[in-house]
Amino acid sequence: MISRYVAENKTFEKQFLDGSLEVELNPQGTLAERIRAGGAGIPAFYTPTGVGTLVAEGKETKEFNGRIFILETALSADFAIVKAWKGDKAGNLIYRKTARNFNPMMATAGKITIAEVEELVEIGELDPDQVHTPGIFVQRIFQGENYEKRIERRTVI
């Protein structure tokens, strides 16, 4: 599991502690850049984020202009699963709010991208200037039915 945060899932915790699940934590910006690089065909990049921490353990480092950087490799996947607000039957996608943070780059980093949309429209109904992910990156699209967002842990009274 490569993640920036793994929450408080008891099953996840048990699998990690018994050794059946491997975990690699990345700072959020580094994780985003690894995914973006994978989608762009860039094999690796250097970042100063994480130098001198557990994040850097076992990774190649290099000094540039007196500053140490960590070599991070790109991430890509066989499948990318994204959720968009609206999409057309050609796979063009529009995201809303924070869904614009990771979904567009995730779509580029998957060999096969599967998109769930709240509203599926005909080709030509989306304003091209509003499209965040072009259909070239989407191989499967469907309209979802249920959008329940559970609270992970209540932190306010």
Task: Please place each PLM-identified region on the residue numbering.
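Conserved alpha/beta enzyme-core scaffold
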Residues: 1-157
